[in-house]
Amino acid sequence: MLRWLRAFVLPTAACHDAEPPTRYETLFRALDRNGDGVVDIGELQQGLQSLGIPLGQDAEEKIFTTGDVNKDGKLDFEEFMKYLKDHEKKMKLAFKSLDKNNDGKIEPSEIVQSLQMLGLHISEKQAELILQSIDSDGTMTVDWNEWRDYFLFNPVTDIEEIIRFWKHSTGIDIGDSLTIPDEFTEDEKKSGQWWRQLLAGGVAGAVSRTSTAPLDRLKVMMQVHGSKSMNIFGGFRQMVKEGGIRSLWRGNGTNVIKIAPETAVKFWAYEQYKKLLTEEGQKLGTFERFISGSMAGATAQTFIYPMEVLKTRLAVAKTGQYSGIYGCAKKILKHEGFGAFYKGYIPNLLGIIPYAGIDLAVYELLKSYWLDNFAKDSVNPGVMVLLSCGALSSTCGQLASYPLALVRTRMQAQATVEGAPQLSMVGLFQRIVSKEGVSGLYRGITPNFMKVLPAVGISYVVYENMKQTLGVAQK
């Protein structure tokens, strides 16, 4: 179909200047299915699909947002032609940024080099597969005509936006606080898109955590009490019997409230650490991103850690033990002192490294596997691939850091367990292994894994809807 597009609409011997209006008019007429002189979004969707022209996610909406100058919900010919001319200019700049040797063609080695500068590392073979999806004449290089035809109606405007197909962020929240922060481009920062995306992610996280709160509380109860006899159904039955259905959400308020300060501190710290680790104008590589993200996570955890302790104390509390978040904080301060708000802080910090490291490593592995085996028809992996990769890599990160998370939770709550000795991190590890075996370090991991799929689905749906509500430009 791309060959058809070039032959029918865009001449093969086209110069690098904008196409003559008559060529745009031919394409416009092909899209104007009812012949009324304007193209609405339905006609654009149907027309482009029938022509086999590749589209990015929500491409039609973005084309209309940019091209519909008079905001009447339709594109007339002048708006249509102006959009294509402006878009081709931007795609020309993207093409030149990839064409390192200025020979008018993009080769696999240039793809590898450009992506490395953006912190995305792929092999020459993977670059060839990407080029195959764009290369229409089988030369294993992409010239300007092929590049323009492929991205003609894909509203990406620069190479960074193209690469963000594989940005390790999909707005999912599985309830953990150790993930590396999102990456935002300079354009997103200047336009204010960054805070809208963070807000959308925060709302998605709040809804997701609230929806899966019963499983999260069950996990905490199993971590703290460590009884082999407490299974999932027995745990739920015990919680409902003790405090009713509402008790299943005990501690969720704190878990939701801490999203805002944690996200804000993590984002600010991440930007500062990136500046420290990279020179001005230098792109952030995977290793620098890992270090910056880990340090930002540690900074955010230091700031909001008292809320982590409050969440655990409220989750394991009996009905009427605390009057609320403030009452819980007041009791802890009165009876245990300020230091109690940082119990379990060390294992929590230590857990950041294996979590963030394995999360990134598994994501890169899954990305490479997809590029090697499935990247034949499009450079865009699609929503389901990104969600699956993100969820699986986060789950692997959780699995690696879970023993530290369990010890952290027990240290936070051990003052509330009658007859329990106040042990250090090492002492707790030794006690758990000696009394419960190595499997004791993974107590509660089943409900933790059970909440991953619903958390991913709920947070993604809410995130996408919130982005639309807040006017975040779709990629």
UniProtKB/Swiss-Prot annotation:
SUPFAM superfamilies: EF-hand, Mitochondrial carrier
Segments of this protein annotated with the region Linker region: 159-168
Molecular function per GO: adenine nucleotide transmembrane transporter activity; ADP:phosphate antiporter activity; ATP:phosphate antiporter activity; calcium ion binding
PANTHER family named in the record: SOLUTE CARRIER FAMILY 25
Assembly and binders: Monomer.
Residues that bind Ca(2+) 1: D32, N34, D36, V38, E43
Residues that bear N6-succinyllysine: K318, K435
InterPro entries the UniProt entry points to: EF-hand-dom_pair, EF_Hand_1_Ca_BS, EF_hand_dom, GDC-like, Mit_carrier, Mitochondrial_sb/sol_carrier, Mt_carrier_dom_sf
Domain notes: The regulatory N-terminal domain/NTD formed of two pairs of fused calcium-binding EF-hands, binds calcium in the mitochondrial intermembrane space and regulates the antiporter activity of the transmembrane domain/TMD. In absence of calcium, the apo form of the N-terminal domain is intrinsically disordered and binds to the transmembrane domain, inhibiting the transporter activity. Binding of calcium leads to a major conformational change and abolishes the interaction with the transmembrane domain and the inhibition of the transporter activity.
Residue span of region C-terminal transmembrane transporter domain: 174-475
Family membership: Belongs to the mitochondrial carrier (TC 2.A.29) family.
Annotated ranges, domain EF-hand: 19-54, 55-88, 86-121, 122-157
Statement: the UniProt record of this protein carries the keyword Mitochondrion: yes
Mitochondrial intermembrane compartment spans: 1-197, 271-293, 364-386, 464-475
Disulfide bonds: none
UniProt-annotated stretches for the region Regulatory N-terminal domain: 1-173
Protein name, UniProt field: Mitochondrial adenyl nucleotide antiporter SLC25A24
Keywords annotated in UniProt: Acetylation, Antiport, Calcium, Membrane, Metal-binding, Mitochondrion, Mitochondrion inner membrane, Repeat, Transmembrane, Transmembrane helix, Transport
Residue positions binding Ca(2+) 3: D99, N101, D103, K105, E110
